[in-house]
């Protein structure tokens, strides 16, 4: 399960650190505090990112997720988020990027657009570029695309070795690397 950290008190953070309750799975969405507030419709959502910094400083193992919304937290925003999240290595072990799930039951909700094949190809190019860079610099691919991106783009999914030696529940329960 992933948490946004918005409802987590400072006492909760200290308890996690004291008792080493890890890993903490965080739904980041974006590292832009203002955008995160808008996306989560919570005025404290941007401040919640400081809690992830606190976990990092305490050496708490984390995993992350970004639910990508077309035209909102993709492209340049995704680039910035990956760059900032990679600073949390090695304690932030991996980040999965998945497309927002859209259904026909969206009446009264913020209008979101589905990603196209071309969009998915661009997202994969961006993620693969970061994977190559981080593997060279840090020895980890770190950022992983949800299987939906490969299906939508019409591309084969990566081999198990691209999951940095842990092709297990840490990534598979997030829809990453299911073969």
Where are these regions (language model features)?
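Conserved Radical SAM active-site core
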Residues: 1-91, 102-130
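Auxiliary Fe-S-binding modules of radical SAM enzymes
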Residues: 86-88, 94-96, 100-179
């Amino acid at each position: 399960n992933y948490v946004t950290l918005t409802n987590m008190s400072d006492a909760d953070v200290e308890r996690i650190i004291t008792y080493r309750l890890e890993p903490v799975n965080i739904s980041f969405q974006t590292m832009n505090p203002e955008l995160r507030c808008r996306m989560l419709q919570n005025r404290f959502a941007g401040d919640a990112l400081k809690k992830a910094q606190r976990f990092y400083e305490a050496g708490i193992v984390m995993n992350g997720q970004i639910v990508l919304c077309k035209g909102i937290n993709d492209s340049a925003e995704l680039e910035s988020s990956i760059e900032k999240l990679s600073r949390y290595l090695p304690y932030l072990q991996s980040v999965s990027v998945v497309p927002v799930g859209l259904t026909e039951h969206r009446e009264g909700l913020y209008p979101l657009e589905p990603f196209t094949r071309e969009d998915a190809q661009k997202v994969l190019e961006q993620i693969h570029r970061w994977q190559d860079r981080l593997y060279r610099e840090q020895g980890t691919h770190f950022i992983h695309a949800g299987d939906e991106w490969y299906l939508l783009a019409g591309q084969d999914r990566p081999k198990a070795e691209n999951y940095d030696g842990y092709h297990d529940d840490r990534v598979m329960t997030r829809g990453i690397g299911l073969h």
